[in-house]
């Protein structure tokens, strides 16, 4: 699944596939699904006004965004150079736009075989 966004007047493609959780673990040494759940819970708390902003790990947002871009374009350099190539980068806005893409890996798509 892919999505193209315009960031800092550049078109950037983001992609999630079956290997996204594995790449995330290899790149950042953290569990993709655990981080997605953590962020989802933090965002729910923000919406209800009960969030403790000091407990939200904003690095996770940046890491997931970078990984989805790197999955779409293998030529992207390291995370520091990539983010540094933008004059500005609205992390939370971009993250919001990519939620459907991220959640695609968490939805059940395997159908159970029917018994004869």
Range-by-range predicted roles:
Residues 1-11, 31-53, 59, 71-116:
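Charged interaction scaffolds used for protein-protein
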Residues 14-16:
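Short capping micro-motif at the N-terminus of alpha-helices
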Residues 18-37:
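Short, surface-exposed, low-complexity cationic segments
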Residues 21-22, 54-56:
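Short low-complexity stretches enriched in small and charged residues
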């Amino acid at each position: 699944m892919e999505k193209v966004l315009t960031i800092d007047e550049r078109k950037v493609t983001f992609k999630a596939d079956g290997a996204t959780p594995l790449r995330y673990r290899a790149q950042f040494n953290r569990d993709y699904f655990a981080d997605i759940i953590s962020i989802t819970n933090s965002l729910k708390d923000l919406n209800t006004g009960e969030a403790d902003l000091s407990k939200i790990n904003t690095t996770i947002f940046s890491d997931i965004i970078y990984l989805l871009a790197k999955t779409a374009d293998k030529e992207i350099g390291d995370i520091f150079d990539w983010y540094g190539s933008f004059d500005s980068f609205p992390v939370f806005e971009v993250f919001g736009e990519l939620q459907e893409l991220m959640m695609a890996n968490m939805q059940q798509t395997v159908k159970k075989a029917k018994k004869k």
